[in-house]
Amino acid sequence: MDFARARKPHTVRFKDDGLIPNHPRWPLIIYRNAVAFDESLDAAAVIEDLFEANGWGDSWRDGIYSYVHYHSRIHEALGIASGKGRVRFGGNKGRIFTLKAGDIAVLPAGTGHQCLSADDKFLVVGAYPPTGTYDECTSAEHRRGALKAIPKVSAPRKDPVYGTGGPLLKLWKKSK
């Protein structure tokens, strides 16, 4: 059964704010209502299976940290399995989005993110492409190495939601 719905992506590019580098070329991608599931299914498992089918693994289930952080050596997909939360992307000077069940955000390496508030049902499934190394950057001491590492993280071969024909491949390829 196919749970992914065709959706036009919402994209936002963030500038380096002096603490959070963000990605120098590629935008944050948000797919609204990208995943459909009914109450009889384990929504988190549906998202995990979707990510895994598209080559994004090492999945986890939790919330999003309440402090600003980013990953300098890997991209990240965040699928909302239940509830809703207000998440700021791009660092302290970034933008706030309300994410709800069925939404998926795909963050290029370097994109700052933090949860500002969430309801009690807010559950996120995170996953990563097969290339890259997980790290967590939170302070100015990480910045120098991050600025060198972020542009070296290769574009994924598959969109975590739509696979080889997904919008991510075009958006991240053409945004140079």
PLM region descriptions:
Residues L99-D119, Y128:
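Conserved metal-binding segment of the jelly-roll/cupin
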Residues I74, V87-F97, Q114-C115, P130-T133, ...:
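A structural preference for long, well-packed, hydrophobic secondary-structure segments
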Residues W56-G57, G63, S82-K84, N92, L116-K176:
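Double-stranded beta-helix
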